Amino acid sequence: MGDSLLADRRALVTGATGFTGSHLAHALRAKGYHVRALVRDPDGANAKRLAEGGIELIQGDIGDAEAIDQAVARMTHVFHIAAVYRTANHSDAYYERINRDAVGYVLEAANRHGVERIVHCSTCGVHGDVAEIPANEETAFNPGDVYQRSKLAGEMLAQEAARAGAPVSIVRPTGIYGPGDDRFLKLFRTVENGTFRVFGKGDIAYHLTYIDDMVDGLILAGEHPAAIGEVFLIGDDSYTTLDGLVAEVARAVGVKPPSLHLPVVPLMLAATACEFACRPFGIDPPLHRRRVAFFTKARAFSVDKAKDRLGFQPKVPLADGIARTAEWYRQEGWLKGSGKTAA
């Protein structure tokens, strides 16, 4: 494991029970770091898997400044991955508390405890719908929803700390996918069963990052001297189109890709109506405007800065990553022929 080489490196990972955070925590442990995870429920299944992997658990909530301070104590590295994502059940204030205020708590605690390196995980979504592709780290901000706005507010705190001399690095991932994540399951399932429909022309740009490459980028941001004070987009070597992504998924599940393209405006109107009807009751609407953005918002980025300055090199091309993800879904029983039913 190399513990003798990195025994003095102690890393806190927030969001370690989530998809990206769990992969990162295990990767750091494999490199020889002592890894600590801030978790709300140490008895939860994901937390238990961390503990089984030799990761220290400390109980607390990411929105609790005192809990964060205790978690940061005696750490040399902090990887702040925790965030709240898009659901209809959270208020705008909750997004701000977790995606902005908690960043401040992490930065303040890291400063108090003399942490050597801090990595803040932002999102490429701070750029919103990209007008000219590929975008880069200097592209104007254009957040399109409360999640993106709150993530931008958190990143601004990290940038401010970096300008003040804190050893902060900021990573903006493109769409993260791979084994362990079920956010793309609906796409795989509907393509497999023939019910997926492409709204719009299908030529909108789409940029993904396989989880192993994402973890490599995060670790480089936390270790490479050139990363301090900088912002890096992390993603695959190249972007694709929506039609290209769907074609890869179809290949991985063994079906022909859909050829029919439907108009997107009626779908957006339906999504808007669903959200307004469901929000007063705290119900997660069956259709979100954010889901419609999947068909309309361009997301394509250059990762040249990370490659040139950090030596970042994506290793898993889209076709391989999609195939690996499909295989994991099969193993979980979530695709046809696997004999199980998804939770």
Protein language model features and the residues they cover:
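Mid/C-terminal beta-alpha module of Rossmann-like enzyme folds, strongest
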Residues: 220, 224-287, 303, 319, ...
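N-terminal Rossmann NAD(P)H-binding glycine-rich loop of SDR-like oxidoreductase domains
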Residues: 11-31
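Substrate-positioning beta->alpha
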Residues: 149, 153, 181-186, 199-222, ...
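Conserved Rossmann-fold NAD(P)-dependent oxidoreductase catalytic core, especially the SDR/UDP-sugar
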Residues: 104-147, 169
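NAD(P)H-binding glycine-rich loop region in Rossmannoid oxidoreductase-like domains
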Residues: 44, 55-101, 109, 124-129
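Short alpha-helix in the Rossmann-fold core of NAD(P)-dependent oxidoreductases
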Residues: 98-103, 119, 150-151, 207
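Active-site Tyr-X1-5-Lys
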Residues: 144-169
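Flexible, glycine-rich beta-alpha linker
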Residues: 128, 166-185
